[in-house]
């Protein structure tokens, strides 16, 4: 089956979640019934929002409901793995809705593939990134006291079909991370391509590079 790339641009989180779920359910149904389907790689950005995964702890959100309103943000409890994270303008979010079995992937291998694609995109900008032991996502200087996260990853899988995905900080307002313990960490920082390079980064260019890396990785399986 073919894999298509879609760009939702700036979209409210609730609408993106609803669309994702609809396409995810349709792919699961098609797979179970031997029908044709399309794998999708979705790019978007969200207005200010925090999402708390299934294993997340409420105390990693440091603001109450009224305080969230004052910073123009909302909070959603969602069905992905992982803890709490932030999404907002300037952050590239990618939601692959894929039949992993078509690509010969298990869930652990899939998460590794997402990380590797982001690591390669960072490298294309001269930013050296990698993994942190016993943690998901993509990090800079992960084995030092200056460890900082540039990309969060949290997925849901059912019948080897995926939804949710990754969030890469490109030109993200990093102040919004100060209101949470990102991904449950209290002793790790966050960063962005803009922060590391000292300049604004063209979002369309990052989308193109990440889309190319993801497709290449999937097709190599």
Swiss-Prot record:
The keyword Transferase is assigned to this record: yes
Localization annotation: Cytoplasm
Gene3D superfamilies the UniProt entry points to: Bira Bifunctional Protein, Domain 2
Pathways per UniProt: Protein modification; protein lipoylation via endogenous pathway; protein N(6)-(lipoyl)lysine from octanoyl-[acyl-carrier-protein]: step 1/2
Highest taxon, organism lineage: Bacteria
Gene Ontology CC: cytoplasm
Principal cellular location given in the protein's record: cytoplasm
HAMAP family: LipB (MF_00013)
PANTHER family: OCTANOYLTRANSFERASE (PTHR10993:SF12)
Name of this protein: Octanoyltransferase
Natural source organism: Bacteroides fragilis (strain YCH46)
Protein encoded by which gene: lipB
